[in-house]
Amino acid sequence: NPFSIINTATDRWQNRKRGWKALGLQSEVGRDARAFNIKEWMDDTGDVQVATQSDTSIFDPALCELLYTWFVPKPDKSQVHQRPQVLDPFAGGSVRGIVAAQMGLDYYGHELREEQVLANRQQYEDIGGEGICTWIPGDSAKTLIETYTEEFAADFMLTCPPYGDLEVYSDDPADISNMAAHDFDEAYADIMQKALAHMKKNTFVAVVVGDYRDKHGYLCNFVSKTIAACEVWGCRLFNEIILQNVVGTLALRVARQFETNRKIGKLHQNVLIFYNGDPKTMKDDGWHTMNLVQNRTLAEWL
C-alpha cells in the first residue's frame, strides 16, 4: 500500500529482497576495504562493534522495485525511445541499474570509481534484463554535462548520495564523501541540479537520504539540504516516505550509545519524492509494471 511508512522488517519485504538477491545481485562487489568509514561502527570508547566489509551499505532492491512501480510512467508509444529512462547521478553499486533493466527500463548511472563501474558492468552482463544499463565513469559534476545531447531527457531519477563522510568510498579528491562539510554541501547541490537539468517535465525524482552526524555529534540536516537543492531548480517536494530499517545490530549498540551520549539509535531513512512540473498534468493511464514472466527466478519469491 502507498503509505508514508515502509517497514522493511516484514516477512513479505524480506522475501522480495531475497528474490532479487537470488538473481545474483552483489552490489558490494567493486568496493575495497576503504569503502566504508569504520568510525560510524565504533562507540565513544573506541570499541569496534561491527567492522566487516559486509557492513558497507547496500541499496535495497525491493525499494527499487517499489519506486519504479509507483513513479515511472508507462512507455510513450509516440516517442522514438519507448523504454522509460532512469537517471542516477550517484550510482554506487549495481542494484538500481540491474533492477531497472529487469523491469524493462533503461538506466544511466554516474559513478566516480572505475573499478566500481567495471564490477557493475560485469554484474549486468551476468544477470541481464530487458532494459539497458549504462554506467558512466568519472566525476558526476563533469560527466552529467559531457555525456548527453540536448535531446536526452529522463523519465525518472532514483539516487542515493553519500551521507557526508559516513562512508568514505575512495581517496579521490573528486569524491564528495572525502570533502569538508561546506565543500560537500556545495558539490552535492551542484551535481543534483545538473542531473535535474536532464529530467523531462512532469516527472518524479526520488532521493534516498538520511541525516548523519558531524564530527561534534550534531545532525547535519541532510534531508533539508536535499530539499533545498531540488527546489532551487523548481523540483518541489511531493511525498516523503519513512523507510524503517531492520533493527539488526542496532539493538546491541543503542543501549551503550544512549547511556554514553544520549544519541538515539537511527532506524530509518528518508525517501524524498519530488515532482518536476505541474501535478495537475499527471495522467491516470497507469504506471510502469514488471513482466514477471520474464523474471521467473524472482517470481518464485513473490
What are these regions (language model features)?
Residues 1-302:
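Class I S-adenosyl-L-methionine-dependent methyltransferase catalytic core
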